[in-house]
Amino acid sequence: VYSRIQGKTWWMTEHLFNDGENSDDSSKWEFLKWQYSLNHLGKEIRMCMEGYCSAYIYWYLKRFYGLMGDTDKRSPTSEGEITKNGYIMAHYAQYATETTRIKVVTNNEEVCATAYLDEKTGEVTIVLLNLNGASQWLEIPLAGIKKASAVETNETKNMEVIDTGLMESAEGITVLLSANSITSVRLTFK
């Protein structure tokens, strides 16, 4: 499908990620679970970005299945507070906006990645989804990195700063990805 739209502007709107919402039994509200958010919204946005999507539009900003909580009893957060879907979207909104998508490859089927170049600053950001139920060390072998920073969202963290380390060869960095997480790593080369 990507070859048919190459060179064209295209965009995607979210659809309802609200499985189980009609049940009176809150244990069936799948949309409240972190794993559900990561495997649905997280993967969908990543696939759109991988396909050079021009924009991903999320219509329902303030709704129990949206980016911010509302007064609905099914809301995972208090009214006006950011939901897990909101934090997933924030990784792309904060780290991919006004950048150029560049190619990135992982050698691990359970870690998905998209990368972005800020042509003004030369910074590169990699947004990583660890779809594994276990933490994983990741090496980013790029020469010339002067500074690296990372933030992560998982079941218990929301855009929290995490450590990065220099590889022994000094030709890249390492980062520990939590189980079932989305992590944004920003690399500075100047």
Predicted regions and their residues:
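Solvent-exposed beta-hairpin/edge-strand motifs
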Residues: L142-M159
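Aromatic/acidic polysaccharide-binding cleft in carbohydrate-active enzymes
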Residues: W11-H91, I102-V111
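Carbohydrate-binding surface patches
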Residues: N107-K146, N180
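Hydrophobic, well-ordered secondary-structure elements that form the walls
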Residues: C48, M89, I126, A150, ...
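Acidic (Asp/Glu)-rich catalytic clusters
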Residues: Y2-G7
